[in-house]
Amino acid sequence: MKQIKSELMILGINPILILAFLVVVFTLIAIFAGEMLNLSLIGFEVIFPFIAAIFIGEWGKIKADDNYDMIAAQGKSLISWVLYRSVTVFATVTFFVVLCMAIVFHIRSEIPLQEMILIYLSPAFMLSTLTVLCNLIFTHEHVSTLVCGMIWLLAMLSKSMLRYPMTEYIYLFIRYSGDRNGIWLINKSVIIAICAVIWTGICLVYGKKNR
Amino acid sequence: MRKLLSVIYYEYVMQLKRIATWGVLAASVVITLLDGFPSEKNLARIEFLLQPSYFIYRSLSFGALIATFGLMFLLSNRMAIDHKTGMKQLIMASPITKLQYIFGKLLGGFIYTYTVFSLFLALNTLVFYVSVPIDIALTDCLVPFSKALIINVLPVSIFISFISVALPAIVDVRLFYVLASVLFILNAASPDSADKMPFYLITSGDLKKLIWQHPKFPYINTDGIQANLLFLIGCGLISAVPLFLRRKLWRND
C-alpha cells in the first residue's frame, strides 16, 4: 500500500488533469456526435486502450526513468517495482475510463456497461503489456509509446488482414471491425492469455535480476 | 542567416543520425509493401495495382500514415531535449536570437520530415518499378512520384513537423500524444471514398485524389482539396505562433 501511495505521488497531478480533460471531451462527443458514430466501440476498444498504453509508456517509465540506476541498485529484483508502477498507472487510467463509460452509457446506451468494460480490458491489457515490455528494453524516453503507437495504428489499418484464417482470434479490435463470426469473447480470452504468457516471461526474466 | 542555417543543419543531421528514424522508415516501407507489393496474389486482390499512380495513391493511404505517426513522435521532443540536456543554456549564451532558434528548429524539422517522407515514397516506388510483372516506362512512375512530392509530401511535412516541434514546447508532451492519437485514429478509421473526404485527414485526404482517380468517378472535388490543404498548412503554421509569443522560451534580450 505504501508503495502504491508513493507511485501515486510520483505520478502527480498532470495525468489526472489530462484524464479529466479526456472525460470532458468524450462527454461532449457523446452529446454532440450524432447517431452515425458508435462511440462506445471506437472509444473504448480502440482509443482508450492506446491512451492507457501512452500513460504507461510516459508515466510508468522503467529504464528511461532518471533514477533507474539508483532504484535498480537498491533491490534484488526489478519485478515488484515494475508491477507496482505499471498497475498503479493502469488502475488510474482504468478508473477514469470506467467513469467515462458510465457517462457515455447514460447518454447514448449503445452497449451495456459490462460489455464496454470487457471490450476495453483486453486491448488495453495487451497494449499496456507491450509498453511495459518496451519500458524494460529501451532506455530512451517516448520509444515505448512510439513502438506501441505504430502497432496500434497498424492493427487499426490492417482490418483487411481478417480475411486470413485464425487472424480474427488475435485481432485487437474485433468488435470495432464487425465481428462477423461472433467470436469476440473467444478473441478477448485469447488476447488476455497471450498477455498472461508475456507477463509470465517478464516475471521469469526479471524476477531474479535487478537490471 | 549563417547562424540560422547552422541551427537548421545541426537539427537536420542530428535527427537523421537517430536509429529510430531509420527504424520508422524501414517499418513503414515494409508495411506498405506487405499491403501493396505487386505480387500475383495482390494483383488479383487489388484492381488497379498495375498502375504506378494507384500504387503511390495507396501508399499514401496506408504506410504513409504510419510513417507520419512515427515522425511525429521523433520530432516531439526537439525543444524539450535542449532544455533537459542543458543545451538550451549553451545556445542562449551564444549570440543566437529567439527567431533564429525557433526558425532553425522548425525548418530543420520540416526538411527532415520532407526527406524521410520522400525516401519512403521513393523506396516504395523503386521496389514497385523493379518488381511489377509488366513493362512500365520509368516516366510512368516518376510523374506521379514527383506530383506526390509537391502535392502531398510538402503540406503533410509542414503539418507534421510544425505541430510536432511547436506544440510539445507549449503543452505537456503527453497531452500532445493523446490529442494526436485521437486525430490519427480518426484518420485510420475513415474509409476511402470517391466523395468528399473529411478535411482533417493527414495523408489520405482529398489532396491524394490529384495523384490518382477512380475511373468511375473522374471528377475533382475542389472544395475538399482546398479544405484539406488549408487544414494541413494552416494548422502547421498556426501551431508555430505560440512559440514566438511565449516569453519564457528565451532569455530577456
Each model region followed by its residue ranges:
Chain A
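Aromatic- and glycine-rich beta-strand/loop motifs that create alpha-glucan
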Residues: M1-A20
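Aromatic-anchored segments of alpha-helical transmembrane domains
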Residues: V23-I31, T94-A102, G149-S160
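Short, hydrophobic transmembrane alpha-helix segments
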Residues: L28-S40
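Long, hydrophobic alpha-helical segments
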Residues: S40-K63
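Helix-loop-helix units of permease transmembrane domains in multi-pass membrane transporters
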Residues: G57-F90
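Hydrophobic alpha-helical transmembrane segments that constitute the membrane-spanning cores
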Residues: L83-S109
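Hydrophobic alpha-helical transmembrane segments of polytopic membrane proteins
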Residues: E115-E141, I194-T200
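Terminal transmembrane helical anchor/hairpin motif
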Residues: S144-R211
